[in-house]
């Protein structure tokens, strides 16, 4: 049960465009709060008939409270969806479901705290860790947004509750009154530039996470790039409390679920925010020790004959892969898919961690050209099914302790998503373990 009053949004009308996982959840939540909804999806507009729901093309938005676009639908760049142009022409706000959640919580009378987490990399881990800290401490807590559950599908929390919302740049562009009691910007490196025009546009979108904050609120900002440093200065000038995190100055966290120096920054951000919102040191320490980590993010999925298999399928850009490579002395590296702008040239300082690369996907040649320039040995494997056994054999032959899937590329050439890619990797590793090698599958207990 959502806990929101069934008449909370009575008299309000919403247009919802995009009926994937997020959009469908938004429709159900709005209907559950008494709103009228007109919904449409250009590809699949199949929803069961319900009171107050109209499934029809969005050709007239007159009288609508707002248009809620699914995150993947552009409202400006690279080309605005026609319904976004229509909304602007008719003076209708374009909002994210996180904005509607905030309004619904406050309209319900709850004073629950809001935490917003963003950044190019690390935001899912940090979001999950913050939520884990509050949950293990016994505080009512709900986490979602870009991670897992759609924001508007989260339940109503009491006054001492905490919402932890992972915010993508797409969501942040569509906020209005949303006011975080604590917000975190971990880092900024080029990503989604087709949606934001350039790096300045991307940074401006991310900076919205600090909108509406005041002197009692906390902004935690990573200081490892010029964009974040500039935003920190701007936020501090408004009187908001700013805590600056320098990854190189933080002591590394050695917990098995959070390997690598980059996770020290994620941990630092989570601990700072948890403390600001009332958790004591003992509760934080207890939660930190029991945090299991996230799937597809430096996740150890198997160990065979002394070789660890690490699933980092979420690492779809070079910046994320740099953190993974830095976490290990030497690896057999599996990479490839649909290359991102800039390729992997920026990984050159980390190539010393690669004993050999095993390339897959449509842009394997692009990665191969860079590796060849820098003298990094590689094999063209084409698929994960060929790459994983080849990397394992090479690891045994060369006494390398880690096979790392950290693709530096998008997955949609061969897989439905990065999760699908990671799951395929896990299955292949599991087959290797079952083939007679002396190995273990650390994920097995979670699945049983």
Curated annotation (Swiss-Prot):
Pathway: Cell wall biogenesis; peptidoglycan biosynthesis
A GO biological process held by the record: peptidoglycan biosynthetic process
PANTHER family cross-referenced by the UniProt entry: UDP-N-ACETYLMURAMOYLALANINE--D-GLUTAMATE LIGASE (PTHR43692:SF1)
Molecular-function annotations in GO: ATP binding; UDP-N-acetylmuramoylalanine-D-glutamate ligase activity
Annotated protein name in UniProt: UDP-N-acetylmuramoylalanine--D-glutamate ligase
Keywords: ATP-binding, Cell cycle, Cell division, Cell shape, Cell wall biogenesis/degradation, Cytoplasm, Ligase, Nucleotide-binding, Peptidoglycan synthesis
Enzyme Commission designation: 6.3.2.9
Gene: murD
Enzyme class, UniProt record, top EC level: ligase
HAMAP family referenced in this protein's UniProt entry, alphabetically: MurD (MF_00639)
Function per UniProt: Cell wall formation. Catalyzes the addition of glutamate to the nucleotide precursor UDP-N-acetylmuramoyl-L-alanine (UMA).
One term under GO cellular component: cytoplasm
Cystines in this chain: none
Catalytic activity: UDP-N-acetyl-alpha-D-muramoyl-L-alanine + D-glutamate + ATP = UDP-N-acetyl-alpha-D-muramoyl-L-alanyl-D-glutamate + ADP + phosphate + H(+)
Protein source organism: Gluconobacter oxydans (strain 621H) (Gluconobacter suboxydans)
Record localization: Cytoplasm
Binding residue positions for ATP: 119-125
């Amino acid at each position: 049960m959502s806990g929101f009053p069934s008449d909370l949004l009575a008299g309000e009308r919403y247009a919802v465009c995009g009926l994937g996982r997020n959009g469908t959840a938004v429709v159900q939540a709005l209907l559950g709060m008494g709103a009228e909804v007109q919904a449409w999806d250009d590809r699949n507009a199949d929803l069961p008939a319900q009171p107050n729901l109209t499934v029809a093309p969005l050709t007239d938005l007159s009288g609508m409270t707002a248009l809620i676009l699914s995150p993947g639908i552009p409202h400006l760049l690279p080309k605005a969806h026609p319904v976004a142009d229509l909304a602007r022409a008719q003076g209708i706000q374009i909002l994210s479901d996180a904005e509607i959640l905030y309004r619904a919580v406050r309209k319900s009378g709850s004073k629950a705290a809001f935490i917003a987490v963003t950044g190019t990399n690390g935001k899912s881990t940090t979001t999950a860790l913050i939520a884990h800290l509050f949950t293990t401490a016994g505080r009512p807590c709900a986490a979602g947004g870009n991670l897992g559950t759609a924001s508007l599908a989260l339940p109503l929390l009491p006054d001492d509750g905490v919402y932890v919302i992972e915010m993508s740049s797409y969501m942040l562009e569509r906020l209005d009154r949303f006011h975080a009691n604590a917000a975190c910007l971990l880092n900024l490196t080029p990503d989604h530039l087709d949606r934001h025009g350039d790096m300045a546009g991307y940074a401006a979108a991310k900076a919205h996470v600090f909108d509406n904050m005041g002197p009692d609120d906390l902004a935690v900002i990573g200081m490892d790039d010029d964009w974040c440093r500039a935003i920190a200065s701007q936020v501090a000038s408004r009187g908001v409390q700013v805590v600056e995190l320098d990854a190189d100055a933080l002591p590394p966290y050695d917990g098995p679920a959070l390997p690598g120096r980059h996770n020290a920054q994620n941990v630092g951000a989570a601990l700072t925010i948890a403390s600001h919102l009332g958790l004591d040191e003992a509760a934080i320490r207890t939660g930190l020790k029991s945090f299991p980590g996230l799937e597809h993010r430096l996740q150890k999925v198997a160990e065979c004959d002394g070789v660890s298999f690490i699933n980092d399928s979420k690492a779809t850009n070079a910046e994320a892969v740099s953190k993974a490579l830095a976490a290990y002395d030497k690896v057999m590296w599996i990479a490839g898919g649909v290359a991102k702008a800039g390729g992997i040239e920026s990984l050159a300082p980390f190539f010393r961690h690669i004993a050999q690369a095993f390339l897959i996907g449509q842009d394997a040649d692009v990665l191969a050209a860079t590796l060849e320039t820098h003298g990094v040995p590689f094999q063209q494997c084409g698929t994960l099914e060929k790459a994983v056994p080849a990397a394992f054999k090479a690891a045994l032959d060369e006494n390398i302790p880690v096979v790392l899937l950290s693709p530096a590329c998008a997955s949609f050439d061969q897989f439905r998503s990065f999760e699908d890619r990671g799951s395929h990797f896990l299955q292949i590793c599991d087959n290797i373990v079952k083939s007679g090698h002396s190995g273990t599958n650390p994920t097995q207990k979670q699945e049983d």
